[in-house]
A protein has these predicted regions:
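Short hydrophobic alpha-helical segments enriched in small aliphatic residues
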Residues: 5-9
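Reductase modules of NAD(P)H-dependent flavoproteins
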Residues: 35-44, 49-55, 191, 196-306
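Ferredoxin-reductase
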Residues: 36-137
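Short, Lys/Arg- and Gly-enriched loop/turn segments at beta-strand edges
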Residues: 96-103, 146-154
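Helix-loop module immediately N-terminal to the HCX5R catalytic loop
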Residues: 139-147, 244-248
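Ser/Thr-glycine-rich phosphate-binding loops at phosphate-binding pockets of nucleotides
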Residues: 165-171
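Histidine-anchored nucleotide/phosphate-binding helix
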Residues: 171-180
Length: 306
């Protein structure tokens, strides 16, 4: 049966990519993304001059969440490999030169398309242009992904905390949709802190997509907990994540014990201040920062802030 095939396939690392891709092709539902069903529908002309050694990919779908946030999906180059949680340098031709910025890949490694979640900066060198993209437009991407928010950079544990603010949720959007995350951890907690309630919607959309996915929904089950908080509006869960960690409210709300380096692992992505403060709290709890070449109890992405 297809379910048996899937369960069997992802035992081997390459196998479940194939099974998930096949399922993704069959089950992909684009109704909420206002996008066409096929990549082939676009025969967009490539820009006249594309820099050497970069990919030129076609935008497939764009969804604007607020006046500050949007997500988009684009074609994935044949042969482009990455680990869930990594980032890529993406860009646009502005005038006659390319402008690039680091963006976490929000889609999981098995997805046949690439997804990104972006802030809109009115005078940003790249985002002032990127926020105007439409299906059929061309986005550039450098060929080598990288990043520290990968499962390989953590030592084995029981529970994985993903601490995010703003667009810092993007690498975790990739990881919470990757079966390997649930092979390695019994529990996964995604915290997402924003200023306003409307900015949390991407996280809620991700939860719904996982629940509705034929295979991921069954595999994830109740292993994944979502903890959204806001700092500027009334909401059931309010406050900076570091304040909620320090007071213990985070753990009380989740029904979990405080951080324990024997079982808990962490990943952090967000604003500069949030990275610094969350790192300090994890270290105070006895967790040690790791890296790709030296796995430990938690990792931080410092390549950009969101």
């Amino acid at each position: 049966s297809p379910r048996h095939m899937f369960a069997h396939a992802f035992k081997s690392r390459g196998g479940w990519y194939i099974s998930l891709r096949q399922d993704h092709q069959l089950k992909r539902d684009r109704s909420r993304m206002n996008a066409p069903a096929k990549t082939d529908d676009f025969e967009a002309p490539k820009p006249a001059i594309i820099p050497d050694n970069v990919y030129a990919e076609t935008v497939l779908a764009v969804e604007h969440y607020t006046e500050h946030l949007f997500r988009f999906r684009m074609t994935r180059p044949a042969g482009f490999r990455f680990r869930s949680g990594e980032f890529a340098m993406i860009g646009l031709m502005v005038g006659d030169k390319p402008i690039y910025r680091a963006y976490s890949i929000a889609s999981p490694a098995w997805d046949e398309e690439l997804e990104f979640f972006s802030i809109k900066v009115p005078d940003g060198p790249l985002t002032s242009h990127l926020q105007k993209i439409k299906p059929g437009d061309i986005v550039l991407m450098r060929k080598k992904p990288t990043g520290t928010l990968v499962l390989d950079a953590l030592t084995p544990g029981k529970r994985l905390y993903m601490f995010s603010t703003g667009t810092g949720i993007a690498p975790f959007a990739s990881l919470i949709r990757d079966p390997e995350t649930y092979e390695k951890f019994e529990e996964v907690i995604l915290t997402h802190t924003c200023r306003e309630v409307a900015e949390l919607k991407y996280g809620f959309d991700l939860m719904e997509e996982i629940r509705e996915h034929e295979f991921l929904g069954e595999m994830v089950g109740d292993k994944l907990k979502h903890y959204p908080t806001v700092t500027r509006e009334e909401y059931p869960f309010q406050g900076r994540i570091t304040d909620l960690m320090e007071s213990g409210k985070l753990y009380t709300d989740l029904g979990l014990p405080p951080l324990d380096p024997a079982v808990d692992r962490g990943m952090i992505c967000g604003s500069t201040a949030m990275l610094k403060d969350t790192k300090a709290l994890l270290e105070k709890a006895g967790l040690t920062e790791g890296a790709n070449n030296k796995p430990a109890e938690f990792v931080i992405e410092r390549a950009f802030v969101g």
